[in-house]
Regions:
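Non-heme di-metal
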Residues: 1-176
């Protein structure tokens, strides 16, 4: 759940910020697809963990007993590592609309959201409706996504779909 739901979000936000500035848009779009794929994995792992918490799998429910402190510590460590990455990225300054402090708050906001989804209390003082980077949402959501044909690769073209049995001299009588 940490890997798909919290890790890399500093990097995602930075890449999306370039996309917002109309720089490196291709990279931002590709990372947007990767982030959406990670969201699918996140939904699956959240569903499985919640099923274990409910007791749907007695063996896994037994394993999970007493792991709450470990889960919380793992979230705290992940948040600190993401913040350290943000600090490294912005050691020489910020970019328009993004800096180390905003990214730190963003990571805390995401961590709280992920914790709530698993039935834990939030750890950080960032409200559920206080996304510090609301502009990232359209990069992370598939809603309203429409790709113009000229902006995507079409892979359905038939390649090699013509007969290539032309004989030497076949067009001798042909003139323009």
């Amino acid at each position: 759940n940490l890997l798909e739901g919290l890790r890399f979000y500093v990097s995602f936000a930075c890449t999306f910020a370039f996309g917002e500035l109309k720089l490196m848009e291709g990279s931002a779009k590709i990372l947007s697809l990767i982030a959406r794929d990670e969201a699918t994995h996140l939904n699956l792992s959240t569903h499985v963990i919640k099923a274990w918490q409910k007791g749907d799998d007695k063996g896994m429910s037994k394993v999970m007993k007493g792991l709450d402190k470990t889960v919380i510590e793992m979230f705290k460590k992940c948040v600190e590592e993401e913040k350290a990455w943000a600090k490294h990225l912005f050691k020489d300054g910020s970019i328009i609309g993004l800096n180390e402090r905003l990214l730190g708050t963003y990571v805390e906001w995401i961590a709280n959201k992920r914790l709530r989804a698993l039935g834990f209390d939030p750890l950080y003082d960032v409200g559920a409706n206080q996304n510090p980077l609301p502009w990232t949402q359209h990069w992370l959501s598939s809603k309203g996504l429409q790709v113009a044909p000229q902006e995507t690769e079409v892979e359905s073209y038939l390649i090699g779909g013509i007969k290539q049995d032309v004989q030497k001299g076949q067009f001798k009588k042909f003139s323009l």
